[in-house]
């Protein structure tokens, strides 16, 4: 019974997402929820400059380690720290440091060019609770749902640099004892 209810709910939510009824669950750094319109993002002017600076620095050839060091030495809180405290810069910062994974996830996120991407991950079963990443073609991408912070040219340039600098995690050869 619960499985049937879960499937119906999943179908309903996917249908609404495809019809551009976007559900804003996660608030990205640089954006905040609109005070009166449900499920709409507006630019957070307090943080907009930091997001633009991060994309510009990466597009101009600075690496993720350099940018993370810049953000941490200037006492900028990470997205988690900003969400929890509501401030972007803290002189007494003891927690919420930036790291390369957070930065790279931010640089890959299409929300900064005005698109909303949903259905990135799904739960395999309500019993098992394993989460798997959904292929790009099965994700729900709705263009121009909110005002962009970064222009598309800068975003595309950053994506090209990320692809060039990306590491290859595939095995170059099979290990003899693999799978035993």
Stretches found by the model and what they are:
Residues 1-180:
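Conserved catalytic breakage-reunion loop centered on the nucleophilic residue
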């Amino acid at each position: 019974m619960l499985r049937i209810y879960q499937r119906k709910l999943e179908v309903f939510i996917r249908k609404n997402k495809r019809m551009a009824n976007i559900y804003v669950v996660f608030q990205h750094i640089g954006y905040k929820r609109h005070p009166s319109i449900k499920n709409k993002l507006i630019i957070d002017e307090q943080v907009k400059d930091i997001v633009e600076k991060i994309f510009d620095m990466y597009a101009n050839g600075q690496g993720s380690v350099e940018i993370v060091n810049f953000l941490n030495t200037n006492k900028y809180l990470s997205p988690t720290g900003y969400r929890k405290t509501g401030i972007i810069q803290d002189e007494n910062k003891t927690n919420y440091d930036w790291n390369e994974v957070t930065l790279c996830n931010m640089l890959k996120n299409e929300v900064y060019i005005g698109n909303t991407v949903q259905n990135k991950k799904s739960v395999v079963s309500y019993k098992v609770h394993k989460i798997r990443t959904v292929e790009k073609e099965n994700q729900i991408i709705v263009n121009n749902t909110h005002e962009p912070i970064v222009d598309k040219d800068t975003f595309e340039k950053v994506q090209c640099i990320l692809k060039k600098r990306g590491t290859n995690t595939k095995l170059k050869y099979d290990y003899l004892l693999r799978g035993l």
